[in-house]
Amino acid sequence: MARNKLDGVIEAVRYAPGGKIDFVRFYERHGVVWSDAILLERKDLAEQLKLGKRVVVGKRRANIGSVFETGPAVLQKEANIMTEGQSGNGDNLDGIPVF
């Protein structure tokens, strides 16, 4: 069975006072390697999703730099960014820590 390639993993999120995502802690795939953690603003995350990049929530496994424990996909529904299976208004990345 072929593994689906991921383009990015969101490890943590910070919400602005209005409930929208302010920025996320993000790992980006570069070929067979992954970036260090970067802080990605909401507009840049929305652009990644608009380009069709496959982004999921997850966390990097300790001492194994290129292995992640992954969760649901992150989708953009209209103006909202949410994890797969979520509904409602506003941004909602369920199951990842807030920092």
Residue ranges of predicted features:
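Acidic, aromatic-enriched beta-alpha/helix-loop junctions
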Residues: 28-73
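Short, surface-exposed binding/anchoring microloops in extracellular/periplasmic proteins
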Residues: 2-33
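A generic structural signal for short, solvent-exposed coil/turn residues
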Residues: 2, 18, 47-49, 73, ...
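Short, compact, well-ordered microdomains
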Residues: 61-99
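Short, surface-exposed beta-edge/turn micro-motifs
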Residues: 7, 21, 51-54, 77-79
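Generic surface-pattern signal
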Residues: 15, 50-54, 86, 98
